[in-house]
């Protein structure tokens, strides 16, 4: 466990300014750089699974898996400054029944630099615990006003499938202005318009059962939507200009096999040329890590596999790697609960800084 990260001496006012004040203080200026080293999020039974960096307010929004809540984290103080519960959805994390909902995918609208809205995927945990046997939902896409921290929209995602596919795990805002929500059992991608219209962009036939562990992450650049097919063990791409998506495998050189790939991301600092995908676990790394690919032309017709960065944690599953300010961090779900379906009793959760490792692979 790394010591708490303190704000650089270049920012002496930090002790007097809350995380929510940074946006009004900095205006359109970039968020201050973060010092090298791991960060620690301190919140009882938090169990973070994903995060999204708000460049307007210089805070991170963190989806807390087991209790279906959202935390707001100020990395400059290494402090969880707020945790938001959603009435009728959030619940105690150490009990998977009667309502085992999770928070997972996150989207900032209209973008990370000017965000006023946050979209949050709330998924049915039993779909994952049952290995895809229960695809009945409920699964939701919430929209929260960041100024009031109130939910202004709640869309049920299961109506479009009539309970035949689900497993919603992540979401991505694409260049067409639509939100795309990825489902795992069976592999499917929903398209959600700003007017809250939901359609199926892609679904893998047959619908089953049985249902295998399929797509789990999304990323996009231009008109290209990327995902990770854990069944085929391949990266895939879609063209969002199509009414119905057709997956195309992306050749890798050399080929990197994966079966537990999770959240995907194109860090801003590499100008969309680097793709990161967290993997929960691998044969050589029981706590998983992060796979790194490169597409020099940003088109992702083919990719160069650069290498794998193992997680340094134990009893945890790597779930998401993203950029926060100028650095890259990995969040992992801790597995110290009675079983994989419930939270344990931890209060400290490490965000691993892998900036140096990614830079070394990219160099």
From Swiss-Prot:
CDD domains: MALA (cd12811). It comes from Trichoderma arundinaceum. The lineage of its organism: Eukaryota, Fungi, Dikarya, Ascomycota, Pezizomycotina. Belongs to the TRI14 family. Part of the gene cluster that mediates the production of the antimicrobial trichothecene harzianum A (HA) that plays a role in Botrytis cinerea antagonistic activity and plant defense priming. The biosynthesis of harzianum A begins with the cyclization of farnesyl diphosphate to trichodiene and is catalyzed by the trichodiene synthase TRI5. Trichodiene undergoes a series of oxygenations catalyzed by the cytochrome P450 monooxygenase TRI4. This is Trichothecene biosynthesis protein 14.
